[in-house]
């Protein structure tokens, strides 16, 4: 019982700082507060009543259905533990449209997460059906990979290492704007959308969708 209370106290005071320093709050909790990562997952992510929060999105499902699978493969890459990711995909009725999931291994003290290059290297290797090794990680070519993510830090990280397209899904933006190119504070280029359907209009992405006019 004390550990659960401790998690709550730490989350209230330290979560933001851990996220900023480590890219993911749980890494700071593991390294500095001896939190059991699987206990954290059980009492935090798995305890969230997602069935009451999430529901299938027909527009999102149609967007994924409209991707030409002879031109593009769809993977989910997440900083969550795999059980949480699979649970979300099932609730959203998207499991059958996702070819694979790359997640964080909470059982590994030194696990990588977005936006670290090592995480993206492993994601590329796994999407190509390769077991990550020193050789194929170093040879990872990001130019044929496209990423859309709702966390700007992840998009900037992907753009810096050469992803073919890095798109920030700014769902909370007050501006009603279409897809557009922009730059981060340090000058890193990326694209921003305020609705996922706007991916259809981006130069690189639109070639991945089925042409319904023919």
Please place each PLM-identified region on the residue numbering.
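N-terminal helical cap/lid subdomain that shapes the substrate entry/recognition surface
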Residues: 1-58, 62, 69, 83
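Short, surface-exposed alpha-helical recognition segments that flank or form part
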Residues: 51-55, 76, 111-115
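Asp-based, Mg2+/Mn2+-dependent phosphohydrolase catalytic module
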Residues: 65-68, 82-214
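Conserved phosphate-coupling serine/threonine residues in phosphotransfer and NTP-handling enzymes
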Residues: 78-80
């Amino acid at each position: 019982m004390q550990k659960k209370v401790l998690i709550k106290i730490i989350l209230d005071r330290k979560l933001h700082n851990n996220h900023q320093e480590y890219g993911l709050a749980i890494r700071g909790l593991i390294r500095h507060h001896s939190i059991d990562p699987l206990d954290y997952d059980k009492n935090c992510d798995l305890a969230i009543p997602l069935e009451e929060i999430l529901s299938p999105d027909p527009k999102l499902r149609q967007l994924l259905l409209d991707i030409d699978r002879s031109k593009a493969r769809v993977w989910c890459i997440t900083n969550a533990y795999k059980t949480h990711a699979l649970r979300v995909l099932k609730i959203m009725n998207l499991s059958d449209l996702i070819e694979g999931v790359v997640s964080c291994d909470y059982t590994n003290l030194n696990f990588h997460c977005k936006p670290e290059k090592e995480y993206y290297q492993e994601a590329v290797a796994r999407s190509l059906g390769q077991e990550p090794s020193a050789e194929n990680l170093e040879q990872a070519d990001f130019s044929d990979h496209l990423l859309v993510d709702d966390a700007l830090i992840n998009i900037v990280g992907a753009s810096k290492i050469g992803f073919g397209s890095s798109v920030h899904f700014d769902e909370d933006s007050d501006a009603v704007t279409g897809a557009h190119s922009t730059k981060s504070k340090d000058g890193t280029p990326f694209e921003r959308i305020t609705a996922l359907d706007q991916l259809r209009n981006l130069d690189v992405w639109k070639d991945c969708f089925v042409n319904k006019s023919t």
